[in-house]
Amino acid sequence: MAQYAMYAYCFFAILSLVNTVCGSLGVAVNIPSILLTIKQWVLMLAPIALWGTFRLIQPRNEKLLRRCCEVMVFYYVFSFVLSICFKFNLIPMTQNGLITRTATILTWTVNSIGLLSVIASLIAGCHLGRKHKGSMHQLGTALILVFIVWLICVNILPTTMFYLLGISHPTAFTCVNMFSAFSNTLVYIYAYYRMYRTINN
Protein backbone atom coordinates (compact mmCIF):
# COMPACT_ATOMS: atom_id res chain seq x y z
CA MET A 1 0.00 0.00 0.00
CA ALA A 2 2.86 2.37 0.80
CA GLN A 3 4.23 1.95 -2.73
CA TYR A 4 0.93 2.90 -4.40
CA ALA A 5 0.44 5.80 -1.97
CA MET A 6 3.91 7.14 -2.77
CA TYR A 7 3.40 6.87 -6.55
CA ALA A 8 -0.04 8.48 -6.35
CA TYR A 9 1.31 11.31 -4.21
CA CYS A 10 4.18 11.96 -6.64
CA PHE A 11 1.87 12.06 -9.67
CA PHE A 12 -0.68 14.42 -8.17
CA ALA A 13 1.95 16.58 -6.47
CA ILE A 14 3.60 17.17 -9.86
CA LEU A 15 0.17 17.82 -11.40
CA SER A 16 -0.50 20.38 -8.67
CA LEU A 17 2.89 21.98 -9.31
CA VAL A 18 2.20 22.29 -13.05
CA ASN A 19 -1.22 23.81 -12.33
CA THR A 20 0.28 26.32 -9.86
CA VAL A 21 3.15 27.35 -12.14
CA CYS A 22 0.89 27.76 -15.17
CA GLY A 23 -1.55 29.80 -13.09
CA SER A 24 1.26 32.06 -11.85
CA LEU A 25 2.47 32.62 -15.42
CA GLY A 26 -1.04 33.26 -16.72
CA VAL A 27 -1.07 30.13 -18.88
CA ALA A 28 -4.49 28.50 -19.14
CA VAL A 29 -4.52 24.77 -18.32
CA ASN A 30 -7.80 22.93 -18.70
CA ILE A 31 -7.77 20.29 -15.98
CA PRO A 32 -11.14 18.59 -15.37
CA SER A 33 -12.71 19.49 -12.04
CA ILE A 34 -13.04 15.81 -11.10
CA LEU A 35 -9.27 15.40 -11.53
CA LEU A 36 -8.64 18.44 -9.33
CA THR A 37 -10.90 16.93 -6.66
CA ILE A 38 -9.09 13.58 -6.87
CA LYS A 39 -5.77 15.45 -6.65
CA GLN A 40 -6.87 17.25 -3.49
CA TRP A 41 -8.00 14.02 -1.86
CA VAL A 42 -4.95 11.98 -2.86
CA LEU A 43 -2.58 14.64 -1.50
CA MET A 44 -4.29 14.15 1.88
CA LEU A 45 -4.98 10.40 1.78
CA ALA A 46 -1.53 9.28 0.58
CA PRO A 47 0.26 10.83 3.61
CA ILE A 48 -2.27 9.08 5.88
CA ALA A 49 -1.34 5.73 4.32
CA LEU A 50 2.40 6.43 4.51
CA TRP A 51 2.50 7.87 8.03
CA GLY A 52 0.04 5.23 9.25
CA THR A 53 2.10 2.37 7.82
CA PHE A 54 5.30 3.90 9.19
CA ARG A 55 3.63 4.13 12.61
CA LEU A 56 2.64 0.45 12.51
CA ILE A 57 6.18 -0.80 11.85
CA GLN A 58 7.67 1.08 14.81
CA PRO A 59 8.57 -1.03 17.88
CA ARG A 60 6.92 -0.31 21.24
CA ASN A 61 10.02 1.37 22.64
CA GLU A 62 9.85 4.08 19.94
CA LYS A 63 7.17 6.00 21.85
CA LEU A 64 8.21 9.47 20.68
CA LEU A 65 8.27 8.45 17.04
CA ARG A 66 4.90 6.70 17.34
CA ARG A 67 3.31 9.81 18.89
CA CYS A 68 4.72 12.01 16.10
CA CYS A 69 3.25 9.66 13.49
CA GLU A 70 -0.12 9.77 15.24
CA VAL A 71 -0.12 13.58 15.17
CA MET A 72 0.60 13.52 11.43
CA VAL A 73 -2.15 10.98 10.73
CA PHE A 74 -4.65 12.93 12.84
CA TYR A 75 -3.85 16.16 10.99
CA TYR A 76 -4.35 14.65 7.54
CA VAL A 77 -7.51 12.77 8.59
CA PHE A 78 -8.99 15.92 10.13
CA SER A 79 -8.09 17.98 7.03
CA PHE A 80 -9.62 15.35 4.73
CA VAL A 81 -12.87 15.10 6.70
CA LEU A 82 -13.14 18.89 6.89
CA SER A 83 -12.58 19.28 3.15
CA ILE A 84 -15.34 16.73 2.48
CA CYS A 85 -17.70 18.60 4.81
CA PHE A 86 -17.01 21.93 3.11
CA LYS A 87 -17.17 20.51 -0.43
CA PHE A 88 -20.56 18.85 0.03
CA ASN A 89 -21.97 21.69 2.18
CA LEU A 90 -22.28 19.50 5.26
CA ILE A 91 -20.79 22.49 7.05
CA PRO A 92 -21.72 25.82 5.41
CA MET A 93 -18.74 28.05 4.66
CA THR A 94 -20.73 31.26 4.26
CA GLN A 95 -24.09 32.63 5.33
CA ASN A 96 -25.49 35.89 3.96
CA GLY A 97 -22.16 36.55 2.27
CA LEU A 98 -20.18 36.19 5.51
CA ILE A 99 -17.96 33.34 6.69
CA THR A 100 -19.78 31.38 9.38
CA ARG A 101 -18.41 31.17 12.90
CA THR A 102 -18.25 27.37 12.67
CA ALA A 103 -16.15 27.55 9.50
CA THR A 104 -13.83 30.10 11.12
CA ILE A 105 -13.32 27.94 14.22
CA LEU A 106 -12.74 24.76 12.19
CA THR A 107 -10.32 26.51 9.84
CA TRP A 108 -8.40 27.93 12.79
CA THR A 109 -8.36 24.46 14.38
CA VAL A 110 -6.98 22.73 11.29
CA ASN A 111 -4.34 25.45 10.90
CA SER A 112 -3.30 24.99 14.54
CA ILE A 113 -3.09 21.21 14.13
CA GLY A 114 -1.14 21.82 10.92
CA LEU A 115 1.43 23.81 12.90
CA LEU A 116 1.64 20.97 15.44
CA SER A 117 2.14 18.49 12.60
CA VAL A 118 5.08 20.51 11.25
CA ILE A 119 6.65 20.49 14.72
CA ALA A 120 5.94 16.75 15.07
CA SER A 121 7.60 16.14 11.70
CA LEU A 122 10.66 18.10 12.84
CA ILE A 123 10.85 16.17 16.13
CA ALA A 124 10.55 12.87 14.25
CA GLY A 125 13.26 13.98 11.82
CA CYS A 126 15.67 14.99 14.60
CA HIS A 127 14.99 11.72 16.44
CA LEU A 128 15.59 9.61 13.34
CA GLY A 129 18.71 11.55 12.38
CA ARG A 130 20.20 11.25 15.87
CA LYS A 131 19.24 7.70 16.84
CA HIS A 132 19.32 5.77 13.57
CA LYS A 133 21.47 5.05 10.54
CA GLY A 134 20.83 4.06 6.95
CA SER A 135 17.38 4.65 5.46
CA MET A 136 15.93 5.83 8.79
CA HIS A 137 18.67 8.46 9.07
CA GLN A 138 17.97 9.61 5.49
CA LEU A 139 14.27 9.87 6.29
CA GLY A 140 15.15 11.99 9.31
CA THR A 141 17.16 14.34 7.10
CA ALA A 142 14.25 14.58 4.66
CA LEU A 143 11.80 15.46 7.45
CA ILE A 144 14.15 18.16 8.74
CA LEU A 145 14.30 19.55 5.19
CA VAL A 146 10.49 19.67 5.16
CA PHE A 147 10.55 21.88 8.25
CA ILE A 148 13.29 24.14 6.84
CA VAL A 149 11.39 24.62 3.57
CA TRP A 150 8.17 25.30 5.49
CA LEU A 151 9.95 27.89 7.65
CA ILE A 152 11.45 29.63 4.61
CA CYS A 153 8.34 29.55 2.40
CA VAL A 154 5.73 30.42 5.03
CA ASN A 155 7.62 32.83 7.26
CA ILE A 156 10.98 34.12 6.05
CA LEU A 157 10.64 34.46 2.25
CA PRO A 158 7.24 36.21 2.04
CA THR A 159 8.19 38.71 4.74
CA THR A 160 11.53 39.45 3.10
CA MET A 161 10.16 39.77 -0.44
CA PHE A 162 7.22 41.94 0.51
CA TYR A 163 9.42 44.13 2.70
CA LEU A 164 11.90 44.69 -0.13
CA LEU A 165 9.52 44.91 -3.09
CA GLY A 166 6.18 45.77 -1.52
CA ILE A 167 3.12 43.63 -0.98
CA SER A 168 1.43 44.92 -4.15
CA HIS A 169 4.41 44.13 -6.38
CA PRO A 170 3.26 41.35 -8.78
CA THR A 171 6.81 40.06 -9.27
CA ALA A 172 7.20 39.46 -5.54
CA PHE A 173 3.99 37.45 -5.34
CA THR A 174 4.84 35.38 -8.44
CA CYS A 175 8.39 34.63 -7.27
CA VAL A 176 7.30 33.61 -3.78
CA ASN A 177 4.45 31.49 -5.13
CA MET A 178 6.60 29.64 -7.67
CA PHE A 179 9.53 29.10 -5.30
CA SER A 180 7.18 27.76 -2.64
CA ALA A 181 5.46 25.45 -5.13
CA PHE A 182 8.72 24.00 -6.46
CA SER A 183 10.48 23.63 -3.11
CA ASN A 184 7.47 22.17 -1.27
CA THR A 185 6.72 19.69 -4.04
CA LEU A 186 10.31 18.47 -4.28
CA VAL A 187 10.92 18.19 -0.55
CA TYR A 188 7.65 16.36 0.15
CA ILE A 189 8.19 13.94 -2.73
CA TYR A 190 11.68 13.24 -1.41
CA ALA A 191 10.41 12.79 2.17
CA TYR A 192 7.65 10.38 1.17
CA TYR A 193 10.02 8.48 -1.11
CA ARG A 194 12.43 8.05 1.81
CA MET A 195 9.52 6.96 4.02
CA TYR A 196 8.45 4.39 1.43
CA ARG A 197 12.02 3.04 1.23
CA THR A 198 12.21 2.88 5.02
CA ILE A 199 8.90 0.98 5.22
CA ASN A 200 10.09 -1.49 2.57
CA ASN A 201 13.36 -2.12 4.39
Regions found by a protein language model. Give the residues of each.
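Membrane-proximal first intracellular loop
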Residues: M1-L36, I48, G52-L56, H127-G140
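Membrane-interfacial loop-to-transmembrane alpha-helix junctions, especially the N-terminal start
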Residues: M1-Y9, N61-V71, G134-I144, N200-N201
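Hydrophobic alpha-helical transmembrane segments of multi-pass membrane proteins
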Residues: A2-S24, M72-L82, L143-F162
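Alpha-helical transmembrane segments of polytopic membrane proteins
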Residues: L15-N19, S33-P47, A103-V118, A172-T185
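Interfacial non-cytosolic loop connecting adjacent transmembrane helices
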Residues: G23-L35, N89-W108, I156-S180
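Internal transmembrane alpha-helix with an interfacial aromatic "cap," most often the third helix
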Residues: Q40-F74, S83-K87, I119-G129, I189-I199
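Hydrophobic, aromatic-enriched interface-forming segments
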Residues: E70-C126
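C-terminal transmembrane-bundle signature of multipass membrane proteins
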Residues: V118-N201
